[in-house]
Regions:
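An alpha-helical, amphipathic repeat domain used for nucleic-acid recognition
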Residues: 1-161
């Protein structure tokens, strides 16, 4: 059995490994470069492999950004601010970030926001209204929704009760 720390790969082996890595799930360039460093590849080999992955459509930043934004909004119910921060953290270009934010409509965004806000407000067991408002605001801001949306919804929910 080989020791993973001492394993070396040829360019072809590493390319094959990264084709599988990128085929399994959308990846950004930063994730691929990190994986290449884990495989102890030299910079010249990294360049060859990355060019191969881009040429054969295994690696596409625009596709990654759109898929990331769509999934995080629909599944994890993240707001625009959190999505933008995460994409910037992954070193995605501003152009691709703007394209990614167009993956969901304004109506879908507001519907997700309202559903999440109402569910959070109803499920909170906090009896002190000030603590409840604080927890609600913190939760929604942590999810990445705009502060004006959060505080307008908070006023609306407080008035309903």
């Amino acid at each position: 059995m080989k020791n993973p720390a001492n394993t070396t790969y040829t360019v072809q082996e590493a390319t094959q490994k990264l084709e599988y890595y990128c085929g399994y799930q959308e990846r950004c360039h930063q994730e691929v470069v990190s994986k290449l460093y884990e495989l102890h590849m030299i910079p010249q080999a990294m360049d060859i492999i990355i060019v191969h992955l881009i040429d054969h459509n295994f690696l596409n930043e625009t596709r990654f950004a759109c898929s990331f934004a769509r999934g995080k909004h629909r599944i994890k119910q993240w707001g625009r601010i959190r999505i933008v921060k995460e994409l910037k953290f992954k070193k995605i270009s501003a152009y691709n970030i703007n394209l990614a934010l167009k993956e969901f409509s304004e109506d879908e965004y507001l519907e997700t926001f309202n559903t999440l806000a109402e569910r959070q407000w109803e499920t909170s067991r906090e009896t002190n209204i000030f603590k409840k408002k604080k927890k609600f605001g913190d939760f929604m801001l942590r999810k990445g929704f705009e502060s004006f949306l959060v505080y307008d919804k908070l006023k609306e929910l407080v008035l309903q009760k």
